[in-house]
Amino acid sequence: MKKIKLIILFVLAACILVPSAAFAESPGIGNFEYVPRYTAGQFRDVREDQWFAGYVRSAYNFGFLRGTGAGLFEPERLLTLGEAVVLAARMRSVFFTQGAEFPTADPFFMPYVDYALRYNIIGNGERDFFAPATRAQFADMIYRSLPPGVFAQINNVPDFAIADVSPRDNFGNSIYALYRAGIFAGSDRFGTFFPNSTISRAESSAAMVRVANPALRVSMTLPAEIPAEAIFRRITDAVFMIETFDERERSIRTASGFFITSTGKALTNFHVFDFAASATVTLTNGNKYNIIGFHAVCLESNMAVFSIDAEYDNFNTLTLGNSDLAETGNLIYALGSPMQLMNSLSSGVVSSSSREVDGKYYIQFSAPISFGSGGSPLLNALGQVVGITYLSFTGGQNLNLAVPINRFWDVDILDIPVPFEQVRSLFEAGDGDGENGDYYDYENEYGDEYEDESVND
């Protein structure tokens, strides 16, 4: 199949399904004009007793969508990225011109892509338009296609209140705006989004109609806590075990780490790699991969960002929270591989939100950790990362420290990883005691050769 590619921002979104019995058709807001043009039996695969029937009818009457030919709509088929661009472009055109006339082309979506690029609905780059769109991609395009005033706030959704969306994400502003406007409200009872999930043509119709018809927007309140079992189910496969080896391929230690991008960028402690010549990660499904290089190593914050030799590009990821919001007494969880017991979950509280040790500040916590837990995520009550477990005081009980995750945003991260063998000298000193003291200027050392784009810019 012919491939046309473009990179767009990834945004997390999901649709609340409203039964058709509760559906209320009405004229649209602002410049959206509702013109009854949908006839009985317009689409042979859309029955009036199906939850999405009213949404499909309204979306058609607003001029947002058309069928797929031969009297079909294919409501359950996954929306492709090309189709998502078409919908967002048509919505914008209808809003500003009361029409959506685009020339025919092959592939059909190319005139819409040109329009979307012109009006900043999508960004430049490579992307497979024939691949399924994620809820994230679709939501971001919907928000970027219209003026902010269309999305009037009806819900109080504070920053970091959505369990798996951070305001710091590229798509964060779009998602929080759509939550607050009641366009999207999550795909489970906890309001989580699942950023890489796909979206059906029926679900996309529902979202678009909520934009045009405020009567269908969703009022909701997000929970302050999510049960531990639900957090574990959502994130367990984003956490893995690390094993490091010396030059003779003898095991040195085991530790923990977690994915921060779906393409396999991962985060752990820097000290995990002390004296290491190579390292592997083992996922919960048993798959083992080599660590091939590092996007960042920062001794000052004790963080290392690395990639593995996997071609898979849809890893589950953890959401980075705001460690400044962690308060003494808050419920927290640690998820890692203590004593090689993979993905062991423990719970406790923040014992001190700002514990000073040797001139640096850490989160002190009481969730039990052991050897092998280093580098594992410290999670808040929503399952967001607020720290990276660092050390435990052996002379006490559950006296543990974690590096606050907000330090991550001060780390310069290269898009292209520097090969493991090229940075081995950083690990040979052990615990950051090399010639560069407590901070190594990784970006200046390797940036000219390997930097393409910093994920923290």
PLM features: residue spans?
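A short, Trp-centered hydrophobic/proline-enriched beta-strand micro-motif
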Residues: 233-249, 332
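Conserved active-site neighborhood of the chymotrypsin/trypsin-like protease fold
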Residues: 248-254, 261-336, 340-343, 358-361, ...
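Feature responds to low-complexity, polar/acidic, surface-exposed segments characteristic
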Residues: 18-53, 66-136, 144-171, 185-198, ...
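Catalytic nucleophile loop of clan PA
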Residues: 369-389
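Sec-dependent N-terminal signal peptides of Gram-positive bacterial secreted proteins and lipoproteins
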Residues: 3-24
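C-terminal cap/linker of serine protease catalytic domains
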Residues: 218-234, 242, 276, 280, ...
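Short beta->alpha transition motifs characteristic of CBS
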Residues: 261, 269-274, 346, 352, ...
